[in-house]
Amino acid sequence: MNTEERYEGDLINGMRNGQGKLYYRNGNIKYEGEFANDKFEGTGKFYYTDGNYYIGQFKNGLKHGKGIEYYKNGKKKYEGDYANDKKEGEGKEYDLDGYYYIGQLKNNSFHGKGILYDKNGKIRYDGEYVNGKFEGIGKYYYDDGNYYIGQWKNGLRNGEGVLYFKDGRVIYDGEFVNDKFDGRGKFYEPDGGHYIGQFKNFLKHGRGIEYTSDGKKIYEGDFAYDKKEGEGTCYNEEGSYYIGQIKNDLFNGKGKYYSSNGSVIYEGEFINGKYEGIGKYYYDDGNYYIGQWKNSLRNGEGVLYIQDGRVIYEGEFFDDKFEGNGKYYYLDGKYYIGQFKNFLKHGIGIEYEPNGTKIYEGGFINNKRDGIGKYYNEDGQYYVGQWKDDTSVGKGTVYYQNGNVKYEGDFVNGKFDGYGKFYEENGEYYIGQFKNSLRHGKGTIYFPDGSIKYDGEFVDNIPNIPNIISIKNHICSVK
């Protein structure tokens, strides 16, 4: 017998046997109940130094059998089975926050099947335990009403399981690792849209498919940390779709964009969801463009083709328009090489016949000849001078095929008009006024040697009679 602790009760052969009380050295009671061979045996009450106490069965000095542990305030701490001083078997355990557990225990820990309740008596967890932790199959209820049914390991969701909204709709159905969505799974959005594929650390990661609420595919391909990234196919509501490279949820890299009927709309490079880099675009009328893009607009060098492969335009583009230097081909075979602005010939350029002979070279404004330019007639004659609104106006010169001047002077609406000088092929020439390409007004006709042939008024190219005519040194009056 321990002489350091005081005992009051039955003794047999100098040993505690029967009913008795054992006190701590400070005088506080330690145990009251049955003894056998100096040990707690049978039914008794044991007081812990912290004020908690136990009432129940003992064997060989240890809690063994049925018993109840209490907090010092008298509230129950545990009620159930014991084996060799440990909670083991069926029991009910309470904590100070009001939570309690009903189920199987082993080695002082929840082990086997059991139910954990919150302070309001609502089930928090119903399932299997190993060494005090959720492990095996179990159902857990969250504060917001959502709940999980599935596998657990080491107190965390691990393995296959299903997470539900409180109304029973599925949030996630799949694999878990250390409480997180990890592996293969199916995730449902509140609006009914869902994702089937791989997860990592709660995030879509790996291969997967996104669907609308009615089951139509939105995206199928690679994900990285919850964003579309890698190779994939994106589907639009109207039926068009994209196949290619993706980064940060946007088309990035090489890809193809298709219409709802499966025909290619664009194939080439993308940056942040826009056509950017080198690409080929197919128009509804069969025409197509190959060249540079920026911000989904034609920008830089490119070539526009009609459906049979003939070139319409090749050159520079700015914000989808012909702008800069380029070459434009007309359907009749004629073509233009020069500057453009806002789709129009603007600046310096040259117009050609299909055979490559020049039609016009010079200035253009808003698709019309304007400024200084040179125009070539089919008969070989040509004009050099001022233009406005596609018409020769102002000062200019017309040349014969051999380069000799035919006319130099004023033009109005493409006609000799104003003051000018006209040279006949026989050497004679006229200096004076013109109207509507006819001699009209005051003027003089000269012989090749410079002597005056006629000096006077003209009306619609005809000398105004009567007049004074000077012919070779002979002067006469015409009546």
How would you name each of these model-derived features?
Residues 451-479:
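Long terminal segments
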Residues 6-16, 30-42, 54-63, 77-88, ...:
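Conserved anchor residues at repeat-unit boundaries in beta-strand-based tandem repeats, strongest
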Residues 96, 190, 237, 331, ...:
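Short, surface-exposed secondary-structure junctions/capping segments
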Residues 260-263, 392, 470, 477:
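Serine residues within intrinsically disordered or low-complexity segments
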